[in-house]
Structure formats: C-alpha cells, structure tokens
C-alpha cells in the first residue's frame, strides 16, 4: 500500500517536472526569433531608414473605413518618435448611434508626416473597438439610508427587467506599441504570430517591412469600463504609447490570442479579465517567476489535497482532533464560496472554491460520524457514539471554544455593524455574506486555536495529518512572498501571515511533544514496524 502511494506521488512529481521543462522550451521558442544570417531572402526594417512619421487616431461608428467621410480626428501626434513614450487624455464625442447601445471604433494610423493617411501608400493602421457590451454592475447603496454613490437621473433609470441586459460600456484606455527593434527577419521562416501584423514593401532590390503597430488589448480592464448613457455626449480617452521589443511583442500576441480563445469558448468578459490581470503591468522576468511559483503552488495544492483526503478517508476516531475546528473550516470555506459567487468571480477561482467546500462538508460528516438515510425526498441524520477518549477530547474542545467566544463574537458583531453604517452594498444578502467573509479573514485564525489547546491538553500531535500540513505550509510561505506584490484584498493579505503564526506554533508543539515511533496508531501500524517490515515471500 505504501509503495503504491509513493509511486503515485513520484509519478505526479515526474509529470510536473516534464510539464515545466516543456513549458520553458515553448516559451523560449516564443520570445526568441532567429535573425536572417545572409543577404538573400532577408526582410529589412523600414524604421532603419529613419522616416519622419506621424500618428493619427480617428473615431467612427463603422467597422470598415471606406473613405475619410464621417470620421473624427481625436489625436494627432506630429514628429512622432518611436523611442519616446507618452500618454495623452482627449475628449471623444459620442455619436447618437453609440449612445443608443451602438459601437464606436478607433482607427490608428502611422504614416508619413504631412501626408493624409489614406493618401500614403506606406501607412500602417489598426482598428480597435472603444466600446464593449456587458451587463451593468448592480448599484451599491447604503442599506440604512438608501443613498448610492451615483444618484441616477429619473429619466435614465431603467426598469428592473432591463438590468440583466448587456449595454454598451466605454473603454477609457487605448494602449499603442510599435516594435522598435531594427530586427532583420528571415523571409523563409517568418514567425506566424508577427507575420499578420507585418506589411511589406519593395524598395529597389530589397524587401522592407513597415513599422509594426500593435494595440495592447490586455490593458483594457473591466474595472475601468464606464456605462454609456443616452445623455453622454463626451467621454475621456487616455491614449498611451510605448515601444516594445520583438520578444515581448510575440509574447503579448500569444497572450491576447489565448484570452480571445477563452471568450470564444464561452468565457465572459469578466472571466477573461481575471486572466488579463496576470499580465498587465508585469515585467516579463517577474511573470516567468510567477509562472514557476504558481506551478509549484499547484503541485503542493494537489499533494496536500491527496494526503488530506487519504488521511480523512482512513480516519475512524476523533481522538485528539478538534471537531469545532473542522466545523469552522467547513463554515469558512462555504462562506468564501458564497462570497465569490456573490461577487461574480471568475469560474477559474469559483470552481476550485466549490470543490474545496464540498470536501470540507465531507470532513464534517466524518467528524460527526454522521449517516444519512433518505426517506423519499426527506433526509434523516443519524450520529454515531463517541468513545471515552473522544469525549475527553470533545471536553477540551468545548472548553477552548468557550474562552474563544468571549473575544470572537463581539469582534464579529462590531465589524458587521460598522460595515452596515459606513459601506455600501448591493443587498442585505451581500452585506451578510461580506460580514461573514470579513470575519473569516480577520478572525478565522482564532478558530485554529482550539486544536492547539487540544494538543496542549493531550501533550500529543500524533493525530494530525502532518504531510498535508507540510504541503499547505509550503503554499502559505509562497503566498507570503507575493502577498505585497500581487494585487489582493488587504484582509486576504493579512490572512496569509496569520496562518504562518499558527503553523509555527504547530511546529513548536511537534518539537515539544515528539511522536513515539513505537506506538501503534489507530490503523494498527507503527513507524518502526513500517521501517523494519520484511517483504513478503511465498
């Protein structure tokens, strides 16, 4: 049995190593491009000729531009310098068609200075929608006074039935890039990702590619979107520019394609936005480090999950285990799942949280020795009996919870009342769930203390799932490293460090109460027997 479990763990680790190595090789193939080695079949950069360029941004309601009619010039950058970074905010007129739930497009032209873009044969251009369709976020109000952050005009208020309909939202950012590397491509092995952004021209006997213009769609975040009302006539648009290297450009193209594929598979704009958040404003080297850390986090999560399930599957007795702590973990994971559901969190986060909540419910069933009988559609619960040793553990557990309640309940009630008076919510249910989840994050570690108290009273830690604890501890320390780097709620950030304190106390108790390796555990095994047991021979 032991060798089988060990072999499975080795297999998982082996597959993980192969996956990491393969991913590194694929990433290397994306960011590295082999330059042209000879003179034949080489494609030279047009930017190397140092042309005088101009950047022009137009808006129109049409997705295909046939002529210069019905377009508005919103930004004109003369003497455009590819090497110079800039950011400018302009006011864009919103046409009536767009205000009536229509779409507005931006046309970005990079052309020779002093020449209109549609008269320049060497111009490059891209088109990007400045609007997107989304279901508007429910309005948050003060539940006691009924006041909201933005008081709507009565004429603009929509009926309740229309609140779930997608409406046009404004994208206030337009991020532009130009590939500034004077890279010489090999015409026989052009990367497919960059090729679709390239426009080639013949100058004498040499083929040149015009400046590669790119729109960074990953910078468009859901949190920045603005609802377009019928009374809106102008909206701000921040146009930013920065040069980009060939390696980063290829990587960004692949990432945008991946996000687009998610949307094609049915992911909503909000789900795709969760993925965008990983890449926006992130250094490539830090992004690579994040990938490796996330990969190890996933491995430790799986190993902790496997060992935790294995431990509880064989668990027949609750001697030395805090039932209150098990109940609390179940309650907290269910509350966090409902909170994520109320916040309309991405399925990438919601599904694992739901699986974790289901597992904690199963643990409660094991801890309470609960058997469920179905009489038609009505369930009937039957609870098992506890032994004398289990009742002693339960007595210590109840004693710890009694002392803990004197501190915990006033803090939770006070926090809930404070949030009700000062914070706006969508509904009473939203306030209730937020109050619970804030209590879980802020004071949840206190519910780990009954297990420490039981360990202290019994002078033993042999009953705890130490393998699962170890893997979870690795993940906790990984979370600490990124707690002040990755964007997350402050309460969740503090929760990362509070778990460290409790785990260090667990380690101290393990040192203080060493496990007797000669003692037979509840499964009829001892550590020394496992080590000295000879293989069976027929």
Curated annotation (Swiss-Prot):
Extracellular topological domain residue ranges: 32-284, 343-346, 424-428
Catalytic reaction list: a 6-(alpha-D-glucosaminyl)-1-(1,2-diacyl-sn-glycero-3-phospho)-1D-myo-inositol(in) = a 6-(alpha-D-glucosaminyl)-1-(1,2-diacyl-sn-glycero-3-phospho)-1D-myo-inositol(out); 6-(alpha-D-glucosaminyl)-(1-octadecanoyl,2-(9Z)-octadecenoyl-sn-glycero-3-phospho)-1D-myo-inositol(in) = 6-(alpha-D-glucosaminyl)-(1-octadecanoyl,2-(9Z)-octadecenoyl-sn-glycero-3-phospho)-1D-myo-inositol(out); a 1,2-diacyl-sn-glycero-3-phospho-(1D-myo-inositol)(in) = a 1,2-diacyl-sn-glycero-3-phospho-(1D-myo-inositol)(out); a 1,2-diacyl-sn-glycero-3-phosphocholine(in) = a 1,2-diacyl-sn-glycero-3-phosphocholine(out)
Cytoplasmic side: 1-10, 306-324, 365-402, 450-538
Localisation per UniProt entry: Endoplasmic reticulum membrane
Membrane-spanning ranges: 11-31, 285-305, 325-342, 347-364, 403-423, 429-449
Effect of residue 313 to N: In a breast cancer sample; somatic mutation
Main location: endoplasmic reticulum
GO cellular component, one term: endomembrane system
GO biological process: apoptotic process
Membrane topology listed for this record: Multi-pass membrane protein
Residue positions the entry lists as glycosylated: 91, 101, 229
Keywords recorded for this protein, A-Z: Apoptosis, Endoplasmic reticulum, Glycoprotein, Lipid transport, Membrane, Transmembrane, Transmembrane helix, Transport
Tissue: Ubiquitously expressed.
One Pfam family recorded for the sequence: CLPTM1
GO molecular function: phospholipid scramblase activity
The keyword Acyltransferase appears for this protein: no
Description of what induces expression: Up-regulated by cisplatin.
Biological role: Scramblase that mediates the translocation of glucosaminylphosphatidylinositol (alpha-D-GlcN-(1-6)-(1,2-diacyl-sn-glycero-3-phospho)-1D-myo-inositol, GlcN-PI) across the endoplasmic reticulum (ER) membrane, from the cytosolic leaflet to the luminal leaflet of the ER membrane, where it participates in the biosynthesis of glycosylphosphatidylinositol (GPI). GPI is a lipid glycoconjugate involved in post-translational modification of proteins.
PANTHER family hit by this protein: CLEFT LIP AND PALATE ASSOCIATED TRANSMEMBRANE PROTEIN-RELATED, LIPID SCRAMBLASE CLPTM1L
Family note: Belongs to the CLPTM1 family.
The name this protein goes by in its record: Lipid scramblase CLPTM1L
Species this chain originates from: Homo sapiens
